[in-house]
Amino acid sequence: LLENSQLVGNIGNPVLDKINLCSYSIIELSSFQLEKVKEIKLDFGVLVNIAPDHIDYHGSFSEYTKVKNRIRESKIATEESDPRKLWSIITDRDQRAVMNIKLSHLPHRYQHVLKHDQLTFCNDSKATNLAALKFALNQTSDPYTLILCGDPDKEKYDVFEISGPTKVYIFGKHAKEISEKVFH
């Protein structure tokens, strides 16, 4: 969307390896990075995804929220998450100019990996918390099967209702614990 730009940071491309290779760098900063950085000197900051996450590291949701809000130290800060509206804010150009551009999912983020007959397989392995899971589950109205694993100790919840999938398969080290908390 932005000519001569690159995606770097927590997305998997180290910032320091790519610095000054493009005119614009779109940097995904994790809460860990926001906590460690001394001073934020970003032209634009977008605050997204404040949901109970990494509480085991930050100690509390309040501390996690405080760290995530550091993005507001950018010259311009917004909570807008629609990529087309963001493009309009950043470039100061009308968002209608990009309405027909097809945006693709990032790897492992509700990524469509295979379509066979009437089955579509999506990889959402980056969805490591309930908020991300809820987002993914709301992306389709078609019948689907959910394959789920995770660490219930990373996020505190008593019970989690999943509506939508025709079947739910739970696997992994914590399968028994998760199956006791998830109902379908």
Tell where the protein language model's regions lie, with residue ranges.
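Residue-level signal for inorganic ion chemistry
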Residues: 10, 28, 48, 64, ...
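Flexible active-site lid/hinge loop adjacent to a nucleotide/diphosphate
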Residues: 21-81
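Short, conserved loop/helix-junction motifs that constitute active-site signature segments
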Residues: 38-41, 71-76, 139-141, 159-166, ...
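Nucleotide phosphate-binding/pyrophosphate-handling subdomain across enzymes
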Residues: 86, 90-165
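C-terminal helical cap/extension that packs against the catalytic core
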Residues: 152-184
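Walker A (P-loop) phosphate-binding motif
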Residues: 1-8
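Short, polar loop motifs at secondary-structure junctions
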Residues: 10-13, 29-33, 78-83, 172-177
